């Protein structure tokens, strides 16, 4: 399906010169003088090579037909990450380079969206927010409650994040999966 370059978003799959690319970032740039352009960073799915392309915002780009399905994460091994389709119970192995930076956030039975192209997983989409436990942080210091400074913390998946001073070890917090940033204390 052909679309204009300015409508391409992160996570889209593009078919360029017979090869599939997953969009890592897409930015529309409107200079004061000249033609607006779309700066798109992509990763080739077949071998993981990253490229950066610039298109006029009105250029036509071929977007590959992919189907998004919900999958539950089962386990990881040396071959890759194993998922199960929620409807058909069919299992699918996804290579490590496709999962990429999403790997630390995968936990047993977590539901994710996998983009499937011709029977092969080409991209993964995590839930926007996920609940994790703080396993290491500095102790709470009295009198710090008025300041809005954040302190470093290590979460149960090994990701480092910045948390407010009142958060201690063992506290469950909600973080954004995109960058690991603190959202709120978990309500459970």
Curated annotation (Swiss-Prot):
Pfam families reported in the protein's UniProt record: EFP, EFP_N, Elong-fact-P_C
One of the record's GO molecular function terms: translation elongation factor activity
Concerning SUPFAM superfamilies, the annotation shows: Nucleic acid-binding proteins, Translation proteins SH3-like domain
Q: What is this protein called?
A: Elongation factor P
Q: What does this protein do?
A: Involved in peptide bond synthesis. Stimulates efficient translation and peptide-bond synthesis on native or reconstituted 70S ribosomes in vitro. Probably functions indirectly by altering the affinity of the ribosome for aminoacyl-tRNA, thus increasing their reactivity as acceptors for peptidyl transferase.
Similarity field: Belongs to the elongation factor P family.
Gene assigned in the entry: efp
Which pathway does it serve? Protein biosynthesis; polypeptide chain elongation
The protein's location, in the record's own words, is: Cytoplasm
The record ties this protein, via Gene3D superfamilies, to: 2.30.30.30, Nucleic acid-binding proteins
Q: What is its main location?
A: cytoplasm
Q: Name one GO biological process term.
A: peptide biosynthetic process
- Key words of the record: Cytoplasm, Elongation factor, Protein biosynthesis
Read off the InterPro entries from this record.
Elong-fact-P_C, NA-bd_OB-fold, Rib_uL2_dom2, Transl_elong_fac_P/YeiP, Transl_elong_KOW-like, Transl_elong_P/YeiP_cen, Transl_elongation_fac_P, Translation_prot_SH3-like_sf
Identify the domain of life.
Answer: Bacteria
**Which Gene Ontology cellular component terms are annotated?**
cytoplasm
């Amino acid at each position: 399906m052909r679309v204009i370059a300015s409508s391409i978003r992160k996570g889209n799959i593009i078919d360029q010169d017979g090869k599939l690319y997953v969009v890592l970032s897409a930015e529309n740039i409107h200079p004061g003088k000249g033609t607006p352009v779309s700066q798109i960073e992509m990763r080739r799915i077949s071998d993981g090579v990253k490229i950066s392309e610039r298109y006029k915002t009105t250029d036509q780009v071929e977007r590959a037909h992919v189907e998004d399905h919900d999958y539950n994460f089962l386990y990881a091994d040396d071959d890759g990450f194993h998922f199960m389709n929620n409807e058909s119970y069919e299992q699918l192995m996804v290579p490590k380079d496709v999962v990429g930076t999403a790997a630390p956030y995968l936990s047993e039975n977590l539901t994710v969206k996998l983009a499937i192209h011709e029977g092969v997983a080409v991209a993964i989409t995590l839930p926007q927010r996920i609940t994790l436990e703080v396993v290491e942080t500095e102790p709470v210091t009295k009198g710090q409650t008025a300041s809005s400074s954040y302190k470093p913390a290590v979460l149960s998946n090994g990701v480092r994040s910045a948390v407010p001073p009142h958060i201690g070890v063992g506290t469950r917090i909600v973080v954004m999966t995109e960058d690991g940033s603190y959202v709120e204390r978990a309500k459970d």
